């Protein structure tokens, strides 16, 4: 059984793929380079970023599950692949913690001000809520009132079954609540 724990800033870091290894290497370089210097710095651990901020003309979307689904809708191609259906999750598909770009911008602003008086901070930037890949697809189906044809692919051996942030430090330091953690708010801009 896969543990349903949330990852906090002090959790043991055990990357399962090269992407995770590169993120950890960058954290180590930043910490090693700056810990004994006068520089103030933050390590922000992004979970799965979605959305865009069209009001500010920053409308380049990040390549994510949400973008893949919205591109399929745009092209009227309602076929989609899911990598794996035998995970120990609510519906067998991988679970992720998604955070909207608007919430990330608010976090960045608060971290910038925090660093004026504090040397360093490491923060999880996630919603603290898990959604499975299938739940995300079903939410889009509900929004567009149309079903997707889903094909399940062989699971990548490096695929993480479930991941979720413990964002309690973020809430404690900044009284920051993630405003777009409900699935319908996450898909609203797509």
Question: Which stretches of residues belong to each language-model region?
Answer:
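Catalytic helix-loop patch of NAD(P)-dependent Rossmann-fold dehydrogenases
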Residues: 1-50, 54-64
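C-terminal catalytic core of Y-nucleophile DNA break-rejoin enzymes
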Residues: 65-66, 100
